[in-house]
Amino acid sequence: MDFSPYAGRWVALTENNTVAGVGTTRDETRVAARAARPKERLRLAWVAIYPPYIPLPEWPLAELHNLLPKEGIWLAGGPVRDLLLSRNIHDWDFAVAEQGCALARKVANALRAAYYPLDNERDTGRVVVTDPHTHRPVMLDFAVLRGGTLEEDLRRRDFTINAMALTLKGVLIDPTGGQADLNARLIRMTNPSSFKDDPARLLRAVRQANALHFHLETRTEMALRAQALSITTVTAERIRDELLDMLRTVPAAHGLQALADVGLLSHVLPEIQALQAVKQSAPHYYANSQVHTLAAVSAVEGILVLLKGEARPSSTDTYVPTPNWAWERLAEALLPFQAALLKYLDEPVNAEMPRADLLKWGALFHDVGKTETRTVGNDGRTHFYGHAKSGAYSTETRLEALRFPGKAIAFITTLVAEHMRLATTYKEKLTRRAAYRFYRDAGEAGVAVVLLALADAMAVWGRNLTQPRWRALLRNAAALFRAYFERPTEIVAPPALLNGHDLIALGLEPGPQMGRTLEVLREAQAAGEITTREDAEKFVAATLTGAET
């Protein structure tokens, strides 16, 4: 959008960055905006008087105005790129001539926020503060210039679109042509040694191209392909973080395919690359297991979009050609559980790893076991007996190598190990006993397993998905959601009616049989066969009598 007509004035911006109000002061602008858009959440920005007339957000810049030095400080890197693209900014990077940590500490104290010294050697400090608009934590980083001047600092950065800076008055500094590359939608390295200086940039180039829907500039792509092997010199933690960000972008499947195309996937996720050679027969819509995997990732994204109430996916999706009626039936089935599912998926398994993120990783790895379990029957059809359990082991090994936290590994491997459960039981109406056994095995990952199973079914059947099959799958999925969200103490985790001491009092000898009896008892309770302590005692007595005879 062209903001030049508003140069030197305040504007109120909507979520999609359209102007809802204009004024010479903040208060005047707020009044005008509220009159025009009383129900919308708006953000204020001051439009710079210098080309390209960038709207500078009120928060945090106005908040920091009196705290920051008047000279020797610039907004730099990603935030400048995002301002030029009219994208929301989640983290703010400031380049300063001196005293980065001291300035960060000063800002943290003034905002009553948390301060962290990121890199004492390079004098870089971080402030973590809550954004008043989104109520989410935001990072403000203050880093001393690398090199003697701002221009030298910018030329050392990864890509031209990330090598721009902005004075606090809105003057753009662009020594490498980043604005032109933004307009051309190109990812271009700032200098020929960019990837050699930091091989993690190899992954970042593909990730940012996917996230921004940009293309790799020709020489940059050639250098990336030539140096792909050097990604193996990067620490596992940095590779993990880049891949986490890659999977968070939409569509993630396109980014993963791009990693394969440039020769990076085989080095960072060899199990996924290996699926390229694994062929599968009907009913799979895709004969190639890797393409099927990307379709499953796309289907998970479609489900997440559906739950958020955003644009409904269509049958024209690149990887998931599921009929439109299937998405409509899915939306209807998920609607009663929408709020509960969103809350469940937003909860973190580990710091900054919500279940929604790990669900995508489950989709990515769900079929890696097919590489080792593929067989061909006498009829010429391929089979993958035991691929879920085999895949869980391979997944655990890869995630450990990438230094994933233990809880995240357990969650993702459970998704892989259990992803076939819904598909193998869809022909029969789900019983309370079956629901209990499902959650006993899947634990807190159970709800995510159901969502993955639905995504997998869409990827398996594609346009060939039938209404009776889909109806049955959705029926059992809804039953599992109902058990977890509405009847947890009845079906998922019923409170024990008896304990080990009670069993001893009833005549059971201590030993392994005691644990088995308690589990049988709990399963019967979940099935609704026993509801009281008296029922439980009679059940145990009958069990003991049967054992004696």
Where are these regions (language model features)?
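Short aromatic-glycine-(Arg/Gly/Cys) micro-motifs in beta-strand/loop hairpins
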Residues: 1-17
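A short, exposed loop/beta-hairpin motif centered on an aromatic-Gly-Thr core
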Residues: 16-25
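Catalytic cores of the polymerase beta-like nucleotidyltransferase superfamily
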Residues: 27-40, 45-549
